[in-house]
A protein has these predicted regions:
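Bacterial N-terminal signal peptides that target proteins for export
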Residues: 2-14
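Bacterial N-terminal signal peptides
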Residues: 14-22
């Protein structure tokens, strides 16, 4: 009797499990019922406009799954990446954009794909005290956009973003240089400040880099190089507070660059 009861219970459990499985399969099958491409795409756009980005990405992906050879599938790939970007899911956006660029290299929206990819990196830029990989990747992507599509409507803003990434990378070099200077590792500090002066000449960090370079040379007792660097600072940034500080460090002597023909960043 006990065995028979157990068999009945086991049988009921099996029936229930089978029903649950069949129900799940039915729901799954129902979720993938093919629908008109325009209906799917419009629903995805409605979700995007409602800022329901998760639902939007799901529906854009569904467009591609159900209608892979439709022109709407190509649009959906790009819009899915855009929805990921809006949701701050930058890694997913970048993956989608890389795939889009690879599959549709001649599409008219490729410049925008590069621009959006650059923005996805740009939004992840961290403080100068931390790793600057995202800054470097943003810079590389924006540079590629400008190189490949110089007349694109996105090129102008990409150039602005490039200047900002340069300033950020220069800030990182300054952060490290100041640390070395504080630790009295003067040669290491000099290399960092020279990197700013040589590679990031248009950034806001150049005046301080010249001042810190002067300071490092003075600490090493290389007075001629200190005076030469201060003269470059005074010639190019005479109203800078950093020149005032360098002027004081050098005993109040004012220095000017002798030759105006020589580029200011090539004096050493």
């Amino acid at each position: 009797m006990k065995i028979s009861g157990k068999l009945k219970i086991s049988g009921r459990i099996a029936v229930v499990a089978l029903m649950v499985l069949l129900s799940a399969c039915a729901q799954k099958k129902k979720a993938y019922v093919e629908r008109p491409v325009d209906q799917l795409y419009n629903e995805a756009m409605n979700s995007l406009q409602a800022k329901d980005y998760g639902d939007a990405t799901d529906k854009f992906d569904e467009v591609e799954r159900q209608h892979p050879y439709s022109v709407w599938a190509t649009k959906a790939q790009l819009m899915s990446a855009y929805a990921y970007y809006q949701a701050s899911r930058y890694d997913d956006a970048i993956i989608g954009l890389d795939r889009y660029i690879q599959l549709h290299p001649s599409n008219s929206d490729i410049p925008y794909a590069y621009y959006l990819k650059g923005l996805a990196y740009y939004e992840q830029i961290s403080d100068v005290a931390r790793d600057q990989l995202m800054t470097e990747l943003a810079l590389k992507t924006f540079q590629e956009l400008i190189t490949r599509f110089p007349n694109s409507q996105y090129a102008k803003d990409a150039k602005i973003k490039i200047d900002l990434t340069y300033d950020h990378l220069a800030g990182k070099e300054m952060e490290i240089g100041r640390y070395y200077l504080k630790q009295r590792q003067y040669l290491a500090a000099i290399n960092r400040f020279k990197t700013v002066i040589d590679n990031y000449q248009t950034t806001t960090h150049v005046p301080e880099a010249l001042h810190r370079l002067t300071e490092a040379y003075l600490a090493l007792g290389v007075f001629d190089e200190a005076r030469k660097t201060a003269s470059v600072l005074g010639y190019n940034f005479p109203d800078s507070e950093w020149y005032v500080d360098s002027y004081k460090m050098l005993g109040g002597k004012e220095f000017k660059r002798k030759s105006k023909k020589e580029p200011w960043y090539k004096v050493w």
